[in-house]
Each structure stands twice: as structure tokens, then as C-alpha cells.
Design a protein with these regions (language model features):
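Active-site helix of classical SDR
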Residues: 122, 158, 166
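Conserved glycine-rich cofactor-binding loop
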Residues: 7, 14-16
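Conserved glycine-rich Rossmann-like NAD(P)H-binding loop of the short-chain dehydrogenase/reductase
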Residues: 30-45
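C-terminal substrate-recognition "lid" of short-chain dehydrogenase/reductases
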Residues: 2, 122, 134, 178, ...
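Residue(s) in the substrate-gating loop at a strand-loop-helix junction
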Residues: 142
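Substrate-binding pocket helix/loop in short-chain dehydrogenase/reductase
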Residues: 98-99, 103-111, 193, 204
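Alpha-helical segment proximal to the catalytic Tyr-Lys
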Residues: 127, 171-175, 232
């Protein structure tokens, strides 16, 4: 796969899955803009690592949940790079809690970042990609968007919403040469899963046919494929990366 001279924006690109995606896209030749909102050190370190490996990367802070901030950031990227080819909507948070105890603030925070944030970014980049008549948009959803999960009604709703956003945007943007697809990770070795209680981890492992958690690089590989010319004829689809947890 060759992404030479492609300009890519990866939201939440400094840690976990986002970091793996940023590093892989850069290794394939893309110039990567690594977004962060409150952890500049992680984004800066990832960008520095990429540059040390001979790649091109920079960090850029903005809140995906704020439409005005997103529009300003995309305008800045276009002013400096003249184009924007790849968007990876990876930024996401959790605010877990049982339905009957969940506060409105927890619901709003997750929907604002995980769903509205993806919409904001998708909308902001679409016009530039339409002018280019080429673009790749990859939304990071989740197995939880398909199966649901007790204690995560907000997260599940946001990730399921991303599925509808992906398919509808794919239909709208296809005539302009833009593909929109999703990648749905299962349980991946990240900060989000490292704090799970032992009994919860054991239950998860028992449900995964491959009997192991995935790695961020597993997800990054699917993203890179969808961002490449190898996936020219794929749009409105979701690639599952879950070890067989959901079939």
C-alpha cells in the first residue's frame, strides 16, 4: 500500500489505536496531522517518533465536539498543505454507568465526542475532498455498536450511530470519488481495556474465539487498507477486527 503525499488527519491520534494508525499511515508515505484535545504530550511524542523514523507528522490541538474549532483546524490544514485526503475519526471517550444511574452529562459527553465529533470532522473535510474528487473517510466504531453492552448505553448508542452516519455519508459522497467506511474493533490492548477487573477480562477472553485481545496495529492495518487505492471499490462498509467475538 502506498500513501505517498497523501495528507491525513487522525483524531485522537496520539494514543492507543490512534497512535498505531498515525504511525502506520506515515510509514506508508502519508503526511499525518495528529489531533489531540487535552493530552498534547502524547500527540507531540507520536509526531516526534514518526519524524525520527523518517516520516512526516505534526500535532494539532482542537476539540472535535466543537464545530467551529473543527472548521478552523481544517482551514488551517488546507492553508498549509493545500489538500486533505484522509480522515480517520478515531477520537472517543467513555463515561460508563448503568442506565438508571447515568447522568445526562455522561450521556452528552460521549455522544458529543464520539458521534457529533465525527460528524463535525466529516462535514468539515467533505467540501475539500469534493473539490479534489478524491477522499478516504474511515470512522472507528466498535463491536459494542453491534452487540450493545450493559453499562455503556451512551457509548453503544454513539458507536451504533456512527454506522448510520457512515452509510449515509457514503451514499452522498460516492459520486465525488470519496469513500466512507468503518472499522469496528473488539477488545484491543489499550488504556481503555487495561483497567478492567480481572473477572471481567476473563469473561471477555472466554467469549473471543481467538482467545486473545487485539493489538492497536491490528486495527491500524484495516484503516490503512481502507485509506489506500486497494480499497477503491469499497464504500459504506464496516471491517470487524474482533478476534471472532462478533460474527
Amino acid at each position: 500500500m502506498n500513501l505517498t503525499d497523501r495528507i491525513a488527519l487522525v483524531t485522537g491520534g496520539g494514543r492507543g489505536i490512534g497512535r498505531a494508525v498515525s504511525i502506520l499511515l506515515a510509514s506508508l508515505g502519508a503526511e499525518v496531522v495528529i489531533n489531540y484535545v487535552n493530552r498534547p504530550q502524547a500527540a507531540d511524542e507520536t509526531a516526534a517518533f514518526i519524524r525520527q523514523q523518517g516520516g512526516k507528522a505534526e500535532s494539532l490541538g482542537f476539540d472535535v465536539a466543537r464545530a467551529g474549532d473543527v472548521q478552523a483546524a481544517v482551514k488551517d490544514i488546507l492553508a498549509r498543505h493545500a489538500r486533505l485526503d484522509i480522515l480517520v475519526n478515531n477520537a472517543g471517550i467513555t463515561r460508563d454507568g448503568l442506565l438508571v444511574k447515568m447522568k445526562e452529562e455522561a450521556w452528552d459527553a460521549v455522544l458529543d465526542t464520539n458521534l457529533k465529533g465525527s460528524f463535525n470532522c466529516l462535514k468539515a473535510v467533505s467540501r475539500a475532498m469534493m473539490k479534489q474528487r478524491w477522499g478516504r473517510i474511515i470512522n472507528i466504531t466498535s463491536v459494542i455498536g453491534f452487540t450493545g453492552n450493559a453499562g455503556q448505553v451512551n457509548y453503544a448508542a454513539a458507536k451504533a450511530g456512527l454506522l448510520g452516519l457512515t452509510k449515509s455519508a457514503a451514499r452522498e459522497l460516492a459520486p465525488r470519488g470519496i469513500t466512507v467506511n468503518g472499522v469496528a474493533p473488539g477488545y484491543i490492548e489499550t488504556e481503555m481495556t487495561s483497567g478492567l477487573p480481572a473477572e471481567v477480562s476473563a469473561g471477555i477472553m472466554a467469549a473471543i474465539p481467538l482467545k486473545t485481545l487485539g493489538k492497536p496495529d491490528d486495527v491500524a492495518g484495516a484503516v490503512a487498507y481502507l485509506a489506500s487505492d486497494s480499497a477503491n471499490y469499497i464504500t459504506g462498509q464496516v471491517i470487524h477486527v474482533n478476534g471472532g467475538l462478533y460474527m
